[in-house]
């Protein structure tokens, strides 16, 4: 717990400390509703959740950008669907990126750490993953973005594996043609060789529709909203988890940026499916 607090606290301090003239980024929060269905046990549950997130970026040299980000999320799914009373606890994720300008496009690398603890020390799941990413301008009003990463977990003493020895891909499209609104649609796919148990592969997918709309004169304060559908399958296990989410919140962009400018500068986040999938491992046990 002390290590967790130190890591997350350090990330948030760096983000808050970045709110100066030579940097840009955002801070925000959202609330939402998660509906989950365990097909194997025929359990259903819905729970509210809250998220706090932030990112800070700075230019490096003539063509580089460094981004640091942090996310903290908590939901209230009951132990009867999570399995064996292992209720979910606060989850968090931190990431770092370096992107390089190539004309109107950006190519880069990223590294991230996810932590999804539950009640009981034998059901805490952590993973490190990293890979390559890119943002490609297709027209003046549209862009596509993509990430491909490898991830691994070493959850000593856990009864299950989490996200062990796996790959994740993320592909999205953004529409920037509105004066004050950014819209994104994206898909995430992942497969790993140790999910619920060591010999059981994980087949994971998530689809999201996301938006941000400016509500003040310079679009620095935005309303955020989104919906997502995810499915988490462990081979050889009758349990399959389906999760649907809807959320609404706000973000404040600092450093003279806005949703669209921040996106074009490289603030695209990291894949969320690894953190989400580890949250449901005890349910598949």
Question: Where do the model's predicted regions map?
Answer:
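Short glycine/proline- and aromatic-enriched beta-strand/turn motifs that initiate or cap beta-hairpins
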Residues: 21-80, 282-285
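Gram-negative bacterial Sec-dependent N-terminal signal peptides
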Residues: 1-21
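Residues on the lipid-exposed face of transmembrane beta-strands in outer-membrane beta-barrel proteins
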Residues: 52-58, 94-100, 132-136, 171-175, ...
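Flexible, glycine-rich linker and terminal segments associated
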Residues: 220, 235, 245-285
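Residues that define the transmembrane beta-barrel architecture of outer-membrane proteins
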Residues: 44-52, 88-94, 124-130, 161-169, ...
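Detector for outer-membrane/organellar transmembrane beta-barrel domains
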Residues: 104, 123-196, 202-210
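Transmembrane beta-strands of outer-membrane beta-barrel pores
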Residues: 31-41, 70-78, 100-104, 111-119, ...
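Repeated loop/turn-to-beta-strand initiation elements of outer-membrane beta-barrel proteins
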Residues: 24-26, 60-68, 102-109, 140-146, ...
């Amino acid at each position: 717990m002390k290590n967790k607090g130190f890591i997350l606290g350090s990330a948030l301090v760096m983000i808050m400390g970045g709110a100066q003239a030579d940097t840009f980024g955002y801070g925000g929060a959202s609330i939402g509703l998660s509906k989950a269905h365990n097909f194997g046990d025929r359990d259903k549950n819905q729970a509210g959740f809250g998220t706090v997130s932030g990112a800070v970026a700075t230019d490096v040299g003539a063509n580089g950008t460094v981004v640091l980000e942090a996310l903290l999320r908590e939901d209230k799914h009951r132990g009867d669907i999570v399995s064996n009373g292992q209720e979910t606890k606060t989850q968090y994720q931190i990431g770092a990126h370096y992107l390089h300008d190539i004309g109107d496009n950006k190519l880069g690398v990223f590294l991230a750490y996810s932590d999804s603890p539950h009640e009981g020390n034998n059901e805490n799941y952590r993973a490190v993953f990293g890979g390559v990413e890119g943002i490609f301008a297709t027209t003046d009003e549209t862009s596509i973005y993509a990430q491909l990463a490898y991830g691994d977990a070493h959850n000593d003493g856990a009864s299950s594996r989490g996200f062990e020895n796996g790959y994740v891909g993320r592909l999205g499209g953004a529409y920037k043609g509105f004066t004050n609104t950014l819209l994104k649609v994206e898909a995430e796919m992942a497969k790993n060789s140790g999910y619920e148990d060591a010999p059981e592969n994980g087949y994971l997918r998530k689809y999201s529709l996301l938006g941000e709309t400016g509500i003040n004169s310079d679009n620095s304060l935005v309303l955020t909203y989104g919906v997502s559908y995810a499915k988490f399958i462990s081979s050889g296990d009758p349990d399959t988890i389906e999760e649907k989410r809807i959320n609404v919140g706000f973000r404040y962009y600092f450093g003279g940026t806005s949703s669209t400018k921040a996106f074009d500068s490289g603030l695209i986040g990291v894949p969320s499916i690894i953190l989400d999938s580890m949250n449901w491992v005890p349910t598949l046990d």
